[in-house]
Amino acid sequence: MWVMVLYDLPTETKAMQKAANLFRKRLEDDGFSLFQFSIYLRHCPSRENAEVHKKRVKMMLPKYGKVAVMTITDKQFGDMEIFHSKVREDPPPTYQQLELF
């Protein structure tokens, strides 16, 4: 399971710039990685864990701007086609889910 955060935050004033940088820093502190500009991804081992991280994102929302949070399955993530300058790239590696008995 992957949690994807997409955002568009205003940076017109120093306070808005600070809020946008703080939001980005908090995403990174919570284990999210930059996928594209204003798009961060985090792998979660289960749906329950993904919900925990979605709640954390909701708690750190800045006052202004747009933020979208979505979850995608490992299968959907693996089916993603990524291109860089018309050259196809492999998506970031997915993680092996360990089963404990």
Curated annotation (Swiss-Prot):
A Pfam family assignment: CRISPR_Cas2
- Protein EC: 3.1.-.-
Which terms are listed as keywords in the entry? Antiviral defense, Endonuclease, Hydrolase, Magnesium, Metal-binding, Nuclease
Instruction: State its cofactor.
Output: Mg(2+)
Which BP terms from GO are recorded? defense response to virus; maintenance of CRISPR repeat elements
Going by the entry's taxonomy, the superkingdom of the source organism is recorded as: Bacteria
Q: Which GO terms describe its molecular function?
A: metal ion binding; RNA endonuclease activity
Q: Which residue positions does the secretion signal occupy?
A: none
List the Gene3D superfamilies hit by this protein, alphabetically. 3.30.70.240
Binding sites annotated in the UniProt record for Mg(2+) = D8
**Entry's family note:** Belongs to the CRISPR-associated endoribonuclease Cas2 protein family.
Task of the protein? CRISPR (clustered regularly interspaced short palindromic repeat), is an adaptive immune system that provides protection against mobile genetic elements (viruses, transposable elements and conjugative plasmids). CRISPR clusters contain sequences complementary to antecedent mobile elements and target invading nucleic acids. CRISPR clusters are transcribed and processed into CRISPR RNA (crRNA). Functions as a ssRNA-specific endoribonuclease. Involved in the integration of spacer DNA into the CRISPR cassette.
Q: How does it assemble?
A: Homodimer, forms a heterotetramer with a Cas1 homodimer.
This chain's protein is named CRISPR-associated endoribonuclease Cas2
Organism of origin: Capnocytophaga canimorsus (strain 5)
